[in-house]
């Protein structure tokens, strides 16, 4: 029987209807966060899709020293707390160091470990100590079966609820490719698997001083992943992605999200029919 992670009234499992994890790449301010959250809550309620709000207080791995990193942990958590209380939605955000875990866990329901840091034992242990759900993004440099080692670490540290996320694998320079087999391979570890449809179309460092991306393939990859049978879709959105401070070339336009989700629900239903 596949593992099911429970978060409030949401059940996350590979055999269950998919959960949507979405929001803007980084927190841009209180007004913007509340605007995005309101739109997303209304849309997911209308479509009856379980929803978890995601946004980052710090983009610590920007390509360039001049890249906009975000509002910082103190202001960021304050804004996420406001989103959580105003819209009664769960929160996931990423942590980049052991020192951030305890403070972040006061607001976030899920701690996300970035792909570049997925093997950092001390960070995994610090996240584990919070007692929160730990969501790990598979490194672009890792084989899917190597996530077993990450799982073993987290379980050794006492984590009961683990989520894994596929976000593409390095394919030469400045390019990623999505191997849909990895979703099934990680699911065999009895861990709910999420597909990151927007970061999977990244072209890391592809613009020289920043990361490029191919937004036009987000829907295609999301359909393919949903057809495999997964626990969740992770998809960053923005009302004006071309002018967003980070990951603009990858993020979906908010106005296009509804039509994509309607299609994904159909794929998901067919795949999971008994």
Swiss-Prot record:
Protein's pathway: Carbohydrate biosynthesis; 3-deoxy-D-manno-octulosonate biosynthesis; 3-deoxy-D-manno-octulosonate from D-ribulose 5-phosphate: step 2/3; Bacterial outer membrane biogenesis; lipopolysaccharide biosynthesis
An example Gene Ontology biological process: keto-3-deoxy-D-manno-octulosonic acid biosynthetic process
Gene3D superfamilies, alphabetized: Aldolase class I
Protein known as: 2-dehydro-3-deoxyphosphooctonate aldolase
Enzyme Commission (EC) number: 2.5.1.55
Organism name: Rickettsia conorii (strain ATCC VR-613 / Malish 7)
GO CC, one annotated term: cytoplasm
Stretches that traverse the bilayer: none
Catalytic activity annotation: D-arabinose 5-phosphate + phosphoenolpyruvate + H2O = 3-deoxy-alpha-D-manno-2-octulosonate-8-phosphate + phosphate
Keywords associated with the record: Cytoplasm, Lipopolysaccharide biosynthesis, Transferase
A molecular function GO annotation: 3-deoxy-8-phosphooctulonate synthase activity
Origin: domain of life: Bacteria
Cellular localisation: Cytoplasm
Family of this protein: Belongs to the KdsA family.
Entry-linked Pfam families: DAHP_synth_1
EC class (word): transferase
């Amino acid at each position: 029987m596949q593992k099911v992670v429970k978060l409030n009234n949401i059940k996350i499992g590979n055999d269950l209807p998919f959960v949507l994890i979405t929001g803007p790449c980084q927190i841009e301010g209180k007004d913007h966060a509340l605007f995005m959250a309101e739109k997303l809550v209304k849309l997911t309620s209308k479509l009856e899709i379980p929803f978890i709000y995601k946004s980052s207080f710090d983009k610590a791995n920007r390509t360039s020293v001049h890249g906009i990193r975000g509002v910082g942990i103190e202001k960021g958590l304050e804004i996420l707390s406001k989103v959580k209380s105003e819209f009664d939605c769960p929160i996931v955000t990423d942590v980049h160091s052991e020192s951030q875990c305890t403070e972040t866990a006061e607001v976030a329901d899920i701690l996300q470990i970035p792909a570049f840091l997925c093997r950092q034992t001390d960070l995994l242990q610090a996240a584990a100590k919070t007692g929160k759900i730990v969501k790990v993004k598979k490194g672009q440099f890792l084989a899917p079966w190597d996530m077993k080692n990450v799982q073993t670490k987290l379980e050794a540290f006492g984590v009961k609820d683990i989520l894994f996320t596929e976000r593409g694998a390095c394919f030469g320079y400045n390019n990623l490719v999505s191997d849909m087999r990895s979703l099934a391979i990680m699911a065999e570890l009895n861990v709910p698997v999420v597909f990151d449809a927007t970061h999977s179309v990244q072209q890391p460092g592809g613009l020289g001083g920043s990361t490029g991306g191919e937004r036009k393939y987000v829907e295609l990859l999301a359909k393919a992943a949903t057809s495999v049978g997964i626990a969740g879709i992770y998809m960053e959105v923005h009302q004006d992605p071309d002018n967003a401070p980070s990951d603009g070339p990858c993020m979906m336009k908010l106005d296009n999200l509804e039509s994509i989700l309607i299609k994904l629900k159909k794929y998901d239903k067919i795949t999971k029919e008994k």
